[in-house]
Structure formats: structure tokens, C-alpha cells
Amino acid sequence: VEISEHLDALRREGALLADAAGRTDLDAPVPTCPEWRLRDLLLHTGQVHRWATAIVRDRLRQPPDEAATRAARGPDPDDAGLLGWFRDGHAALVAELDRAPAGLDCWSFLPAKSPLAFWARRQAHETAVHRVDAESAAGAAEPTATDPAFAADGLAELLTGFLVRPRGRLRSERTRTLLVRATDRPVSWLVTIGRDPVTVTEGAGAGPADCTVTGRAHDLYLLLWNRLPADRAEVAGDASLLDLWREGSPIRWG
């Protein structure tokens, strides 16, 4: 997926998120994130957008400290202005990434072809996952489908970027393997979970695994981001691995 495609996705997903939020009350619970109300979701996503905008705009070479993060986020809006505040922050992020040079030099935290490629990709998927949360809060029976190529790209970011970081919490006393295989894209990943940090092998469709999860890229994307139940995919083998996934895979920033 190219930078321009990630930017198109970021535009689209932010607009869909705002549209869903506008259809319900700020106190509406978010079923996909039970600890949140819609208000929390908008604040979180809007703050992340402003944080990312500041990193790109100011060409920061290291993570912003607490004071810089607070300055980037600005004051929280009141309820009456929250949705407009979200839309403004989303538009500013898209504009900043759109005008950034290809040779942008700034901090990033996952492997990528370039810092610009990283931030366009990360914010597109950040916004897409939270768009699903907003649709959940608005009572949608089904989330808006994501393009298979975009969903597969999101799976790759999650599995080969986030999941393999040394501080990841997904661990097992004995080595166990999970094969993730899409039916509508030629992609698969073999995830090895043990006492050490997770390892992931791409293109591992022929490899044996303790548990194999097969489905559309869209369903796998949301399942592995813990936004859909396991019954949305075909599960073969030791299904308890998916319980282990749900316990250990959520992203932690602390």
C-alpha cells in the first residue's frame, strides 16, 4: 500500500468515524472498548492525531516529552465542541502528511520505508480501528468493510511491527504457534509464541501450527485487533490460543 493510498484511507476513515459519532450520544458506551464512552473515543483519537501532527510538523527526532505532548494536544474541548474539535484535528493531520516531503526526517517507532510512510500508515490504521469503535457505539450491526489490501496491510503492521516488539506481553510457558491466513489476499503469517518475544514469519502458509485462523482479511484485521469475535473466522486446532491472544495482544503505550 503506497503513501497516497494510506492518506486516502486516513481521509476516508476519519470522515466515517466522525459521521458515526454524529449519529449518537457522547455518553454512548463503546461495545468494542467496554471501558470507554464515545466521548473517550473521540478525545483519544483526536489527541493521537494532534500528537502525530506535531511530530511530523516539528520534525521531532525523539518522542515528545510529557510537556510537549500536552502542548500538542491542547486543551480538551467541552462536549458541545468535541466533534468539531475531532474533525479539525483530523483535517490538520491529513494536511500535514499531505504536504510533508518524501524525505521527511522525524521520529517513528516501527519499521517502515521512511518516516512519512510510517506515519501515513500508522495513522490510517489507528483511525480505521477507532472508526469501527465509533460505529459500534452508534449501534451498527456490522462495521463498514475495509478494502482487502488495506486490511492485509493492517495485519502486517500489527503482526510484524507491534507484536514482535521486545516489550510485548504475549507469552506462553511452552512454545505454541498460530497461523493467520487470509482467503481473499495471498498473505499468511506464522506467529510463534513462547517465553521470549514473539517471532513472526511471513508467507508461512505451508507451515504446521497449533492453531490456524482463516478468513477474509477484513475479518482477520478486526479479530486480531480484538474488535470481532473468533467465530467470524474459521478456527482449526487449539482455539485456546485465541484466548491467549486476547489477553496478551492489546497494545500498551506505557
Can you name each region flagged by the protein language model?
Residues P63-T69, L104-L110, T199:
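Conserved catalytic-core motifs characterized by acidic clusters
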Residues D153-I193:
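A glycine-rich beta-turn/hairpin centered on an aromatic-Pro dipeptide
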Residues D25-D65, P111-G168, L220:
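Short, contiguous alpha-helical
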Residues S4-R73, G81-G84, D88-G89, L93:
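Active-site-proximal cofactor/substrate-binding loop regions of enzyme domains
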Residues G81-V129:
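Hydrophobic alpha-helical segments and helix pairs
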Residues V180-H218:
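Acidic/His-leaning functional-site neighborhoods
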Residues G205-G254:
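C-terminal interaction segments
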